[in-house]
């Protein structure tokens, strides 16, 4: 895994920036990249986004609740953010592009397809049945029932989910 700062080995989603951008910092065909993806999938990914901190890490918070101070300090301590799904999506696409082995490429494509289908299913329900009808919340609790919290209609959440769906429809 990559860490946010030297001396802090907490697992966070920021490591995906190194592989999700147009010009990746890490070779997306490397073992390091595959390890990062596996850790993110196992420890941070859920249907509503990526947790900002892995469960079990010091200061982990999975429910966004309490007074203003408690809520503000929990934002980046495990709460789920939908917009971070865009980093995961772009990382998978970059890994597929750079993968030379046909079997591995097929497996990555299957993971991407499953992810996109889950994203469509999850957020179609959100758009029509929960929270602010027609929108997506800023954040979600990181445990079932994954309640929408924070800003009830967040532009960057909507934008990333719509981008994932739109790009999938255009392929």
Descriptions of predicted regions:
Residues 61-100, 162-166:
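C-terminal substrate/ligand-recognition segments
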Residues 1-63, 118-158, 165:
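Catalytic cores of carbohydrate-active enzymes
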Residues 1-2, 21, 74-75, 81, ...:
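Broad hydrophobic/π-residue packing in well-ordered secondary structure
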Residues 69-73, 100, 104, 108, ...:
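Generic alpha-helix detector with strongest preference for long hydrophobic helices that associate
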Residues 38, 79, 83-90, 110, ...:
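Feature representing long, continuous alpha-helical segments
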Residues 22-38, 92-117, 169-171:
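Structural helix-adjacent loops and short alpha-helical linkers that scaffold large soluble proteins
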Residues 76-80, 104-115, 128, 149, ...:
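Short amphipathic alpha-helical interaction segments
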């Amino acid at each position: 895994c990559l860490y946010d700062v030297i001396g802090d080995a907490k697992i966070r989603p920021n490591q995906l920036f190194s592989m999700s951008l147009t010009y990746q910092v890490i070779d997306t065909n490397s073992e390091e990249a595959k390890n990062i993806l596996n850790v993110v999938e196992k420890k941070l990914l859920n249907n509503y986004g990526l947790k900002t901190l892995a469960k079990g890490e010091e200061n982990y918070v999975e429910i966004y609740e309490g007074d203003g101070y408690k809520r503000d300090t929990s934002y980046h301590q495990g709460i789920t953010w939908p917009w971070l799904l865009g980093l995961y999506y772009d990382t998978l696409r970059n890994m597929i592009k750079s993968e030379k082995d046909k079997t591995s490429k097929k497996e990555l494509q299957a993971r991407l397809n499953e992810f996109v289908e889950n994203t469509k299913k999850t957020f179609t329900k959100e758009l029509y049945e929960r929270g602010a009808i027609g929108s997506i919340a800023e954040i979600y609790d990181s445990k079932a029932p994954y309640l929408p919290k924070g800003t009830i209609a967040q532009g960057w959440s909507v934008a990333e989910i719509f981008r994932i769906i739109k790009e999938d429809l255009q392929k």
